[in-house]
């Protein structure tokens, strides 16, 4: 049996793989705390002001590709997740898959192409650390961004064979960003951060904190 990320929901993942949503996890707490320690430069603040201005002017009519091209992509590029020294990179729509045994001991092939993926590897992804899913509107009629993101995170966790190590994720619905962490069979979702407000600083600091965390994991 097989299931694509686009067909996965939180309910499906909970019922079939025993995943459980909790209020918080050490991985998310540490991520937030590390982000609060980061100070942004004047240049970064100027960049963010430009990105935010474009977002405010266009959020109601941008399609998914335009949102990614003009706002999400530049945000990730400013953090610069390409790191040859620590051997990890940011990839887009690269296929990942694995087989996972469900609660009935049936082997399920989970597969898909996350909108974004940070993993070891330079030319192609190897061991994932972070999965990203983007949705243009707050809620699409088909698909569930949080379910898609979590299913990709579950695949990453299985590939790495380190269930105790936090797997990180993020899904964006329009202007709102949500951060996720999966540890073992427990996962949590942060509050939403509105990129058209001062929350943009929080979002950017979370991305920078993620980079530092991945550098530590790959040292």
Language model segments and positions:
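A short, conserved, highly charged catalytic patch centered on acidic carboxylates
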Residues: 2, 13, 20-21, 27-32, ...
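Short active-site-adjacent structural elements
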Residues: 177-181
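A short beta-strand->alpha-helix segment at the C-terminal rim
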Residues: 167-171
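Short loop/turn segments that connect beta-strands within the blades of beta-propeller domains
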Residues: 173-175
């Amino acid at each position: 049996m097989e299931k694509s990320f686009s067909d996965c929901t939180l309910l499906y993942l909970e019922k079939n793989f025993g995943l459980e949503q909790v209020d918080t996890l050490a991985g998310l707490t540490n991520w937030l705390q590390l982000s609060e320690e980061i100070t942004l430069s004047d240049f970064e603040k100027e960049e963010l002001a430009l990105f935010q201005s474009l977002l405010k002017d266009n959020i109601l009519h941008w399609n998914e590709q335009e949102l990614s091209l003009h706002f999400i992509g530049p945000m990730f590029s400013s953090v610069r997740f390409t790191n040859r020294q620590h051997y990890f990179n940011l990839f887009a729509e690269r296929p990942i898959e694995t087989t996972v045994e469900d609660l009935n001991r049936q082997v399920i092939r989970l597969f898909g192409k996350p909108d974004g993926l940070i993993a070891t590897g330079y030319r192609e992804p190897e061991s994932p650390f972070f999965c990203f899913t983007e949705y243009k509107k707050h809620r699409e009629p088909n698909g569930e961004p949080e379910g898609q993101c979590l299913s990709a995170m579950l695949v990453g966790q299985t590939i790495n064979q380190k269930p105790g190590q936090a797997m990180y994720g993020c899904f964006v619905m329009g202007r709102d960003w949500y951060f996720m962490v999966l540890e073992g069979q427990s996962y949590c979702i942060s509050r939403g951060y509105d990129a058209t407000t001062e929350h943009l600083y929080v979002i950017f600091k979370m991305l920078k904190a993620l980079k530092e965390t991945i550098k530590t994991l790959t040292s």
